[in-house]
Amino acid sequence: MVGFHDGAGEPEHADVGGGEVYPAGNFTIPVVAEDEHVTGGAVAEEVAGGQDEVGVDEYAGAVAGWGVDPYQRRQHSYDNAMSDSVSVSTYSGRLRRAQELCSRRGLAGLVLGPGEQLAYLTGLRFDTYERFSALVVPAVGEIRLVLPVVDRDVTPEERLGIKVETWVDGSSPYDLVPTGRIGVGAELVASHVLRLMPGRELVSATEVLTELFVSKEKLELEELRRASKAIDRVHAQVPQLLRPGRTEREIAADLSRLILEEHEKVDFVIVGSGPNGANPHHEFSDRILGLGDMVVVDIGGSLQSGYHSDCTRTYVVGGPGAVSRMYQVLYDAQAAAVRTVRPGVTAESVDAAAREVISAAGFGEFFIHRTGHGIGLSLHEEPFIVAGNTMELLPGMAFSVEPGIYIPGECGARIEDIVAVTEDGCELMNNRPRELL
């Protein structure tokens, strides 16, 4: 999925295992046969703000009509971010490294609100915005989970060595956070940040957290492979959905249903036909598809573990016919970018590889976003594949490669795959055909 961000960090080395590997400098985009099977089954999804369950068709329709926010989980829900597959020692090791990094960077500690950052360190996922809830990780000393007493039921077992501190209405939970120079997580809401300011120097925790998670562990890479295969199975069914006379909204509803058959949750659905495809962040509309329309389909979901899929393909209603020069340039640009991926190369070099191909063909002004973004428990994270990001790629980093060309008022095209850096190149996690379909 296209987005806009910048940044840098100092990631650590990580091993990469399994999968289809493409050494740097020797990459070709394969044509993959249609998937032989697609899993199915009715999936119920919990609606934000309540206990009721809805069936797949009803939920997909709600997503397509924005009657339900598919991103919102019920408040105070708790689940383990990596199910039972992540060991206690893994989470304990992450917490210990966070403390070491705080000491190295001169921080008294970290304070993280509910979200992906807290989930990465503890396995906990919960929402509680009105009352202060946070993981407090001091550089030295006892790690604490601060919760309002009404949310005591969301706490984990004490197996991670985390002390649970509860507070009652009328008391000040902010006194439980150390004073001094504190790294604040991006998911801590502003109202709480403001109350933490007295007696503390608040700085972003991004650099510390990026160093922790930018290179994925083996288990994380396996989850990303699973997610990529799941979204590939959805893309395999897209051509049969794109028929003249159907609306983008109808197709988005179908895609939401299919994503839920393969994932726990729908993250996003983009169906941009004809001129709508020239807007990278178009979602869907009531525009009716016509024969020969180019259609950008960018879709993603998240697994029960919290890891995301994200893949874009461009289709033509009724079949492609002759491949346009624009699309061939885009195809070549993505291949050039993927060939560039290897340890030691900077993130901006991958962006430049795609951009040079597109610019040389005369389409440079129509490539209006970065080439990619990292992916994991967050849909968009480091490394951001963008000009100015001098972060060097290391084995275990996972990110999208998604150049696009957008002609205002006419059409757009984008190809997106998730790749993981290996010891000598990269592993391509998505394997749907990249030709115009």
Residue ranges and their predicted role:
Residues 43:
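Phosphate-backbone recognition surface of nucleic-acid-processing proteins
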